[in-house]
């Protein structure tokens, strides 16, 4: 199936009601159907291919991609696909400063690791019941917010965002730090400052699944390429 047909099947072309549009998205809109803007997939297809290729190249060069999707219908998909390709993710709440104040975030990640170790080795059980419950609640709270980035090990090389409007703080932080931004931008979104714009439906589960599967597949393919390059380098070193 062609990419265009896959997008049509996933409903990528359905935008928002005309009343909610952002005029900056005008060039990506094909028309209006029953008061809803229809996105021009002839524009989306090459832009999406560019974004997927960029993600693949970044990973092939040893880079990390941070997937961000905190809206209800994106949470499970973002988490599942990020885990499938071994990349960090934020799927519940974007903490202000998650990128721009990463030093502080890293301290919280260390705290989470310490508490998890205490739970595993039984240290928590030696505390009073009240202390143990407090620490368990802290683990749950930190895991929910930081669980997806606890193995990130530093700032990402790029972020992939499901909804440019919803995740505007994440985008602003990435821009401040010169981290490349890939974002799904619906007809109500502001495409300004986004490095790789993907005009498309950012609400439908089917559309979100389509994007995330393609990105995760690109990461997995690139990881194979990366390992092949490493293996060749090892062979050359041993020769």
Curated annotation (Swiss-Prot):
The keyword Oxidoreductase does not apply. Pfam families: Ribosomal_S2. The keyword ATP-binding does not apply. InterPro entries: Ribosomal_uS2, Ribosomal_uS2_bac/mit/plastid, Ribosomal_uS2_CS, Ribosomal_uS2_flav_dom_sf. GO terms for molecular function: structural constituent of ribosome. One of its GO terms (cellular component) is cytosolic small ribosomal subunit. GO terms for biological process: translation. CDD domains: RPS2 (cd01425). Keywords: Ribonucleoprotein, Ribosomal protein. Belongs to the universal ribosomal protein uS2 family. This is Small ribosomal subunit protein uS2. It comes from Francisella tularensis subsp. holarctica (strain LVS).
């Amino acid at each position: 199936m062609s990419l265009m047909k896959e997008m049509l099947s996933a409903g990528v072309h359905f935008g928002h009601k005309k009343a909610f549009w952002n005029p900056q998205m005008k060039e990506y809109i094909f028309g209006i159907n029953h008061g809803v803007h229809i996105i021009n997939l002839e524009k989306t297809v090459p832009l999406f291919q560019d974004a997927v290729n960029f993600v693949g190249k970044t990973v092939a060069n040893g880079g990390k991609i941070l997937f961000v999707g905190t809206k209800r219908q994106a949470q499970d998909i973002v988490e599942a696909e990020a885990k499938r390709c071994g990349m960090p993710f934020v799927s519940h709440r974007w903490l202000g400063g998650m990128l721009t104040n990463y030093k502080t975030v890293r301290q919280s990640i260390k705290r989470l690791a310490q508490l998890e170790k205490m739970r595993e080795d039984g240290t928590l059980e030696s505390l009073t019941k009240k202390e143990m419950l407090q620490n368990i609640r802290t683990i749950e709270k930190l895991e929910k917010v930081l669980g997806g980035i606890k193995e990130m090990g530093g700032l990402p090389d790029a972020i992939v965002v499901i909804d440019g409007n919803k995740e505007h703080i994440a985008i602003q932080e990435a821009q401040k730090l010169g981290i490349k931004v890939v974002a799904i931008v619906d007809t109500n979104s502001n495409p300004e400052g986004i490095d790789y714009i993907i005009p498309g439906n950012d609400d439908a589960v089917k559309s979100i699944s389509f994007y995330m599967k393609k990105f995760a597949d690109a990461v997995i393919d690139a990881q194979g390429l990366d390992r092949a390059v490493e293996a060749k380098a090892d062979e050359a070193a041993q020769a």
